Structures are given as structure tokens and as C-alpha cells.
Amino acid sequence: MAVPKFKPSKSRSRTRRSINMRKKIPQFQECSNCGNLGVRHRICLKCGYYRNNQYLEIGL
């Protein structure tokens, strides 16, 4: 049966556990033009803008 030869250091243990403590990145971002919530790095489906440039003509 496998048994650890040495006690793992605090640094190694905490590094392994740190992945669970990482900050979550928000999946949605507010549109700079209309304020609608949408997927990041995509054209806004409500107004057709992305990075203050209009890419889609959306009839209101």
C-alpha cells in the first residue's frame, strides 16, 4: 500500500486547495450602449452594438 514518504509542506497543500478559492468570472456583462445583460465579447442582441460600434441593424 502506498504511503507518503514525507509530510507535504503547507505551501504544497495550500497551492493544491487554492483552485477552489479562485474568484469566479462573471458570465454576463452589461452592454455599454443600452445596459442590457449579455454574454461577454459578443454583440448585444438587443441593440446590435459591440465596443461602441454598431454591427447589427435591429428594428425596434
Swiss-Prot record:
Endpoints of the signal sequence: none
Coiled-coil boundaries: none
Keyword Iron-sulfur: no
GO term, biological process aspect, one: translation
Gene Ontology terms, MF aspect: structural constituent of ribosome
One Gene Ontology cellular component: large ribosomal subunit
TM regions (residue ranges): none
Alphabetical UniProt keywords: Ribonucleoprotein, Ribosomal protein
Superkingdom classification of source: Bacteria
Protein family according to the UniProt entry: Belongs to the bacterial ribosomal protein bL32 family.
HAMAP family in alphabetical order: Ribosomal_bL32 (MF_00340)
NCBIfam families assigned: rpmF_bact
UniProt xrefs under PANTHER family: 50S RIBOSOMAL PROTEIN L32 (PTHR35534), LARGE RIBOSOMAL SUBUNIT PROTEIN BL32 (PTHR35534:SF1)
Name of this protein: Large ribosomal subunit protein bL32
Classification of source organism: Bacteria, Pseudomonadati, Spirochaetota, Spirochaetia, Spirochaetales
